[in-house]
Amino acid sequence: MKLLSFGEVLWDIYPDKKCLGGAPLNFAAHFVKAGGEADIITAVGNDSLGAETLEGIRRLGVGTGCVAEVNAPTGRCLVTLDENSVPTYDLLSGVAYDMIPPPKDCGDFDVLYFGTLALRSGENLCTVRRLLERCDGKTVFVDMNIRPPFYTSETVRFALSNADIVKLSDEELPTVFETVFGRECPVAEDAAARLADGFGGCKLMIVTRGGNGAFAYDCRGKEFYRCGAVKAEVVSTVGAGDSFGAVFLHSYLSGRGVADCLAAASIAAARVVACAEAVPQ
């Protein structure tokens, strides 16, 4: 099965190193590790980091045929980790991934992925609209990936209204709920159900809860599925949500039940948090 992953590819700059990242790339790489195929739709700059980015994407097994080169610096993000290894991101604006043009030919595919961060630019919003026109009969997976201040009511609603499957964290859920409904968020499961039922195309809403596991709401059957977290010694949570979503999606498209998909995704996320890399080799 083939994934098209749209959005930011950037370098996470730590005090002592730099790592290639961005949720769409991490997601695509984990989808490939799960047994699928993936191409990334993004843009890099005509600079040394741009060339390094292309090499890094290919090493992860992700296709680069839909990567554009634009007249802007390759994306960067300054990252710090707190005492619990939770990352804080300082995302630079006006970078290459803010200027992603529609690919001329992205070939056949089964599923499109995007998140809200790359929608911070009007150009990218137009590109996603064009991609969605090619998604008749395809699955659309949205990772909300809320990064203040890079979201608006328009982009949140746009993402939710075009998604078959939505993934977000329990930390993002109140922000998304209050952005959509303009009132305080109820308990997590009620909030997820109201959000999902409020957008007719949504089939599944997945909420990750860190050390408390995850749950999924099946909008068609009005049923909740829950899964506890797999125990792991946490080194870094960077990439854990991406691995969770990618493995869930691959399992789901392979015909597995929602409960089994949650279990497989939880195992994958536990492996990632035990490593320093967002995509462990």
Enumerate the predicted regions with their spans.
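Glycine-rich phosphate/adenosyl-contacting loop at the front of the ribokinase-like
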Residues: 1-62, 233-234
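Structural motif
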Residues: 2-4, 110-111, 165, 204
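Residues at the starts of beta-strands that form the adenosine-phosphate
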Residues: 37-39, 63, 138-141, 164-165, ...
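Conserved N-terminal subdomain of the carbohydrate kinase-like
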Residues: 37-116
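Structural alpha-helical scaffold elements that stabilize or flank donor/cofactor-binding regions
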Residues: 105, 158-159, 198
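Conserved beta-alpha-beta core of the PfkB/ribokinase-like small-molecule kinase fold
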Residues: 111, 116-190, 212-213
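Conserved phosphate-binding/catalytic region of the ribokinase-like
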Residues: 180, 184-281
